């Protein structure tokens, strides 16, 4: 199971991608050939030296130095270019030869011999409703209208209760004792009504 990617030469972009031409052996995009063609190279020092000397220094990349040992690196490369279309690793093989391509719900398929085709299933939905909020605001305004209006009047600032008297809930020596208790009762009713509405 291996994938062949040859980046030895970088010519112009192949026209077969745009003309939808089919190729039985390899498909090219940006000068990088990815295909099922088998390439056998003799893994000896002479062939390796000839191969490396035939390339310009700009074209030598990381794929040419997979190991510090030149012979091991060359052997790794020679084995990597042998591909099997039925193993599911060749990118230009058809989807029928890859049984694992139909597994799962989301599928991304690359077909380089007839252009690039990407299939993905994406679904999203956003729903925003403001109906309940409007009804709630109307309900709150109705409750506010039902609240009793509280009015308190005082003839003079001399009749303000002391803190000690107000904490005990009693009004001693106050001319407005009846008004005080009536006002306190109304405030208690309003507080209870507020608690019930909440």
From Swiss-Prot:
Residues 91-100 have a biased composition (Polar residues). Its cofactor is Mg(2+). It comes from the Viruses. GO terms for cellular component: host cell cytoplasm. One of its GO terms (molecular function) is magnesium ion binding. InterPro entries: Rotavirus_A/C_NSP5. It is found in: Host cytoplasm. The modification Phosphoserine is found at residues 67, 154, 156, 164, 166. Mg(2+) binds at residue 92. The keyword rRNA-binding does not apply. The keyword Nucleotide-binding applies. O-glycosylated. Hyperphosphorylated on serine residues, when in dimeric form. Phosphorylation by host CK1 is required for the hyperphosphorylation of NSP5 dimer. GO terms for biological process: viral genome replication. It holds the Pfam family Rota_NS26. Residues 16-37, 53-72, 77-104 are annotated as: Disordered. Keywords: Glycoprotein, Host cytoplasm, Magnesium, Metal-binding, Nucleotide-binding, Phosphoprotein, RNA-binding. Belongs to the rotavirus NSP5 family. Homodimer. Interacts with VP1. Interacts with VP2. Interacts with NSP2; this interaction leads to up-regulation of NSP5 hyperphosphorylation and formation of virus factories. Interacts with NSP6. Participates in the selective exclusion of host proteins from stress granules (SG) and P bodies (PB). Also participates in the sequestration of these remodeled organelles in viral factories. Plays an essential role in the viral genome replication. Participates, together with NSP2, in the formation of viral factories (viroplasms), which are large inclusions in the host cytoplasm where replication intermediates are assembled and viral RNA replication takes place. Orchestrates the recruitment of viroplasmic proteins such as capsid proteins to these factories. Participates in the selective exclusion of host proteins from stress granules (SG) and P bodies (PB). Also participates in the sequestration of these remodeled organelles in viral factories. This is Non-structural protein 5. It comes from Rotavirus A (strain RVA/Human/Indonesia/B37/XXXX/G8P[X]).
């Amino acid at each position: 199971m291996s994938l062949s990617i040859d980046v030895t030469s970088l010519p112009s972009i192949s026209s077969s991608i745009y003309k939808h031409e089919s190729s039985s052996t390899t498909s090219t995009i940006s000068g990088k050939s990815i295909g099922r063609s088998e390439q056998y190279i003799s893994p000896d020092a002479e062939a390796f030296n000839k191969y490396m000397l035939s390339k310009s220094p700009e074209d030598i990349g990381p794929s040419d130095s997979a190991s510090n040992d030149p012979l091991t690196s060359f052997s790794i490369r020679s084995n990597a270019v042998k591909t099997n279309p039925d193993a599911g690793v060749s990118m230009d093989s058809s989807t029928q030869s890859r049984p694992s391509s139909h597994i799962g719900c989301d599928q991304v398929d690359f077909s380089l011999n007839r252009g690039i085709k990407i299939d993905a299933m994406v679904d999203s939905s956003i729903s925003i409703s403001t109906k309940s909020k409007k009804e709630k605001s109307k309900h709150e305004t109705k409750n506010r209208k039902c609240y009793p209006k509280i009015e308190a009047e005082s003839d003079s600032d001399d009749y303000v209760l002391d803190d000690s008297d107000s904490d005990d809930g009693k009004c001693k020596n106050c001319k407005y004792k009846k008004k005080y208790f009536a006002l306190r009762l109304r405030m208690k009713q309003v507080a209870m009504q507020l608690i019930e509405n909440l």
